[in-house]
Amino acid sequence: MDSLTQITLGAAVGEVVLGRKLGNRAMIWGAVAGTIPDLDVMANLVTDEISALAFHRAITHSLTFSILAAPILGWLLHRMDAHEGGLRNPARWRDLGVAALAIFILVAGGSLVMPIPSLEILKIGSVVTLAIIFFPLLSTLLRALRGISRPPEQRPGFRLWTWFFFWSIITHPLLDACTTYGTQLFQPFSDYRAALNNISVADPVYTFPFLLFVIIASRMAKTGRPRRIFNWIGIGISSAYMIFTFYNKVKVDGIFERSLQREQIAVQRFMTSPTILNNILWQGVAESDSVYHHGMYSLLDARPEVDSFVQIPKHHDWIRPYADERPIQILRWFSDDYYTILRRKDGRLQFNDLRFGSMTGRFDSETDLVFGFIIEEKDGKLVVTGSDERPDTAGDSFRQLWLRMLGSD
C-alpha cells in the first residue's frame, strides 16, 4: 500500500513490541522498519524500467527477507546501543559494515533467480542495501555527535530488537498482499504474486483513523496504560475495516459471477478489485476467448448486479513475434495475463494492464488505461517503457468515479 499507511502500521507495531521500553523511539524505528521493504524502489535509479518492475515487491517483500533481515538489523541496533565513545570508535563502522554485507548478500543473493541480468542484480542489491543501512548510519552519527549513551536497563537487547524488526517488517508485505499489485511473498523459492484484491493500494478510510490514534498515543507517557489503549484502538479499527473489505470482496465476487451468467457470457476466469481510494466502487475483468469483459458495481447500487459489461479486444497476436523477449515475459507475468494490446496514434504498440482499470471508463485510447507500457523496436532491440500519459479530462474522470461510487438506479 502507500507509504503513509506502511509508516503508520510500522509505528503501531513498533509501539506494541517496544513502546514501554523506548516510547516514541519505538514508533520511529517501527516506521523506519515498516518502510524498509519499499526501499526496493531504489532499483529505478540503477537499472532499466522492466527490471525495476520485476524487482518491486520481490525479495524485500518476502517472508524470507522478514525472517533473515530481522536478526541482522536486530544485532546491529543491539550493537549500536552498546557502543561507547565518538565517531572514532572503530567498532561502530565495523558493525555497520558487517550488517551491510549481510543485507547485500540477502538482497542480491535472494534475487539471482529472478529474470534480471546478474550485473543489474548486483547494482540493485548495492543501492537497496545502502538505502536500508542509511537509517542505522544516521542514528549512529547523531548519537555519536551528541554523546548519547543509554544505561543497560534501557537497552532492548538482541532478542527484543530482532522480534521488533520481524513484526515491523513482515506486516508490510502481508498488507501489500491484500492489494491488486501482487506481492512475491515466497521469493526466492517462487515468483508467485500474492494478490487478494480486497483493498485499494491507497484507502484513506483504512489509513487516517489508524494514523490519528497512533498520533494520539505518541503524545502520552510511554509507560501509561492510555498510550497502549489508543494504539490498540487504532490497530483494532484498521483491522475491523480490513475484515469489512474481505466481506465486500466475497459479496462482489458473487455479484459479478451471477451477472456474467445472467448475460450468458462464458468466461475462462475473472477477477474483481476495489477502485482507487475506496472500498465501495468495484471493478471486474472477465476473460473469454478473444475479448475481456469489464464491468463496475457499487455497494450503493439499487440492485445487486452489474448493469453492463464493456468488451475489450485482446489483440494478443500483435505481440506474438516478441513472445520470447524478456520484457514481454515480465509484463505478462506482472499483469497475470490480464492485458490487452492497443495501437497508439503514433503507430507504436501499448501493453495495458487491465487489473488497474481505466481513468475514463473507456479502453480504446492510449491515455485511458491506468497502467500502460509502450513497446517499440530500436536498432533491432525491443524496448519497453512506461506510459505516463494521462487524459486531459482527469479531473472529470475522478468526478465521474465519485458519482458512480454513489450508486446507480
Residue ranges and their predicted role:
Residues 1-254, 258-274:
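N-terminal membrane-targeting hydrophobic helices
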Residues 266-269, 276-409:
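Extracytosolic and intramembrane catalytic regions of membrane-associated proteins
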